[in-house]
């Protein structure tokens, strides 16, 4: 029986230059594997707690030495000797050790690092790819990427209110071809921005961060880039938005679009989205309303839920009990899956199972503070979720996930690229 022999954590850096945890697990056969935990910029207030040191003399208070020490002492002490391949049991032990609903004691960053590293070590010891270990024989589907090519909101220092403008390459036969087309659109977009004397600096997730007069102009120029790159807008490559509207809302559920000098209530904002969807081939809107605006979400779902994908990120925070509330209220039809919002791989799997049971799409997602760790690429294939959101075709911490998916596609001798089949169930 494979057991856990040793566990340790190290403070390393993420893509924003902030500290994060690298956890390593060593098994009884001396197999070793590590995992680096990501970190978000715009976070849902119901997310599991990311433990920071708050020592202003180090990393402006963002150090993670306390979380590392929790791994190196408490977690290590209680997990050594446990069966390594019983992921659910180990993850439950981690939850019990912490004793709070949101990992306020040990830190979700400490717990997730160990959970990820354990899965990776067990897969390695069994000589299995991570996607096969987690997903079994049915892990065959390559996801449609949601590529963030223009950044706004909290991910960029510009005048755009919406956080992400994305492209989805649906009309292709393979992940490789879908990614190639997306890269060509990205480079074409850069040329168009250069021609307009717009900034081509990039945001946290590799998308460009230009200044526009309103939130519609990015849709226009992305549409132009798709067509100029030689692809059919809407048929081969569609559009998607992450509004991150919890960053725009006030206590009265009015939404402040500062880039357009507008203040809209929930119903007015939904009407605005309907205009955009009618004019552009937008197939997905994430966090279209605030995480607390359940009434607004119900209206949005009623108005657009049969037409496009409505993704809850801050709304659901990868939490099965909150998702259950959404299901009961007929809110949204998709959920963003971020393991660090909930704490362990097993809890993440529980949320995915619930979502799939109720025909909610699952989008496996990175965070804005990332690393070279490509765990979520394997995770998306393992769970056949059909969608992955992991940034643009720039910045090596984003490319690491795409390159891993290319490797997996090659290993699977093509696998199944879901493409246009993604939304056919609806």
Swiss-Prot record:
The record lists the organism as Helicobacter pylori (strain J99 / ATCC 700824) (Campylobacter pylori J99)
Recall the taxonomic lineage recorded for the source organism.
Answer: Bacteria, Pseudomonadati, Campylobacterota, Epsilonproteobacteria, Campylobacterales
Q: Which domain of life is it from?
A: Bacteria
Give the record's pathway: Carbohydrate degradation; glycolysis; pyruvate from D-glyceraldehyde 3-phosphate: step 4/5
Protein's recorded name: Enolase
Q: Which InterPro entries match?
A: Enolase, Enolase-like_C_sf, Enolase-like_N, Enolase_C, Enolase_CS, Enolase_N
Instruction: Set out the biological process GO terms recorded for this chain's protein.
Output: glycolytic process
Its gene name is eno
Q: List the disulfide bonds.
A: none
Q: From the UniProt record, which GO molecular function terms apply? A: magnesium ion binding; phosphopyruvate hydratase activity
């Amino acid at each position: 029986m494979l057991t856990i022999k040793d566990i340790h954590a190290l403070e390393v850096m993420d893509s924003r230059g902030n500290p994060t945890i690298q956890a390593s697990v060593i098994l009884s056969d001396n197999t070793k594997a590590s995992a680096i935990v990501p970190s978000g910029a715009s976070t849902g207030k119901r997310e599991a707690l990311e433990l920071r040191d708050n020592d202003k003399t180090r990393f402006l208070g963002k150090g993670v030495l306390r979380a590392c020490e929790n791994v190196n002492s408490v977690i290590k002490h209680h997990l050594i000797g446990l069966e390594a391949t019983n992921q659910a049991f180990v993850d439950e032990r981690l939850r019990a050790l912490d004793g709070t609903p949101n990992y306020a004691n040990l830190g979700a960053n400490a717990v997730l690092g160990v959970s990820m590293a354990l899965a990776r070590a067990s897969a390695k010891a069994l000589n299995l790819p991570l996607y096969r270990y987690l997903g079994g024989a049915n892990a065959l589907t390559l996801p449609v990427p949601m590529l963030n090519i223009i950044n706004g909101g909290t991910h960029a220092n510009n005048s755009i209110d919406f956080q992400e403008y994305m492209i989805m390459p649906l009309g292709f036969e393979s992940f490789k071809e879908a990614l190639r087309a997306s890269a060509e659109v990205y480079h074409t977009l850069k040329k168009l921005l250069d021609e307009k004397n717009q900034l081509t600096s990039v945001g946290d997730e590799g998308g460009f961060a230009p200044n526009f007069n309103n939130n519609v102009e990015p849709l226009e120029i992305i549409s132009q880039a798709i067509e100029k790159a030689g692809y059919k807008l809407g048929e081969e490559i569609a559009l998607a938005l992450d509004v991150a509207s919890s960053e725009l809302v006030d206590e009265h559920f009015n939404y402040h679009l500062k880039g357009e000098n507008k203040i809209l209530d929930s119903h007015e904002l939904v009407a605005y989205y309907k205009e955009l969807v009618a004019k552009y081939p937008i197939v997905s809107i994430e966090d279209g309303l605030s995480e607390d605006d359940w009434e607004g979400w119900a209206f949005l779902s009623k108005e657009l839920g049969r037409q496009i994908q409505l993704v809850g990120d801050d709304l659901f925070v990868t939490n099965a009990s909150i998702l259950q509330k959404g299901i009961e209220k007929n809110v949204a039809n998709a959920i963003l899956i971020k393991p660090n919002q909930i704490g362990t791989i097993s809890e993440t799997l529980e949320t995915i199972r619930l979502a799939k049971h109720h025909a909610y799409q699952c989008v496996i997602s990175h965070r804005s503070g990332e690393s070279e760790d490509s765990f979520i690429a394997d995770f998306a294939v393992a769970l056949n979720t059909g969608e992955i959101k992991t940034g643009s075709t720039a910045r090596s911490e984003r490319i690491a996930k795409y390159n891993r998916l290319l490797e997996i596609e090659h290993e699977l001798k093509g696998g199944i690229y879901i493409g246009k089949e993604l939304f056919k169930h609806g």
